[in-house]
Amino acid sequence: HRIARRQRQMCIRDSYINTIPVNEEKKSNGDQNIERRIRSLIRWNSAAMVVRANKKFPELGGHIGTFASAATLYDVGMNHFWRAKNNKFGGDLIYFQGHSAPGMYARAFLEGRLNEKQLDSFRQEVNPGGLSSYPHPWLMPNFWQFPTVSMGLGPMLAIYQARYMKYLINRGLIKDEGRKVWAFLGDGEMDEPESLGAIGLAAREKLDLSLIHI
């Protein structure tokens, strides 16, 4: 009996499989045509920014395809899931995959938060007004919230962030507002030992407020 009970407990933490059939999935409440157009513009500007920077300085690099492969995930998150901080809500926390930074800059350009001159300064942060290569809150404190490079840093930080929030909630030090911690991983990142270094902690601590996308 004890063995059977233990097996049932272990199964609770097994891999989750989405069993919702397509015909029962809820449709998006957004305008898909507009969202697809916006997504296309952001993908284009992201790639164009990297190309233009490398025409001036070929050694810059820039991971031209990373954002494109996850553009839909980021776009849906921005438009329908992620909630910003305000006076009544602490806000969701997003750990962006580091190599996808060009896409975040491209979106900010479309929203009017960055200008063309700044995009032309991608990966030239040693110059005034240059955009950092990766999410870097020390270099760009008004843009980035969390550092996620070197590779593997993002997933580990996200898990420990979720654990700390859970710790505070369980002790009544902060309110449980339903905030989520999102982490986006990829571009070979899972080969880094740090990427899986804290994954067991997420299971043991039952961190149901963390969402990890690979």
How would you label these PLM feature ranges?
Residues H1-R8, I12, H213:
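Single conserved hydrophobic/aromatic residue that forms the stacking wall/gate
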Residues R13-T19:
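Terminal amphipathic helices with adjacent charged low-complexity linkers/tails
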Residues P21-E24:
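Flexible, low-complexity linker/boundary loops enriched in proline and small hydrophobic residues
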Residues G30, I34-I42, S46-K55, T66-E205:
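Cofactor-binding active-site loop characterized by glycine-rich and histidine/acidic residues
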Residues L60-G61:
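Flexible, glycine/charged-enriched surface loops at secondary-structure junctions
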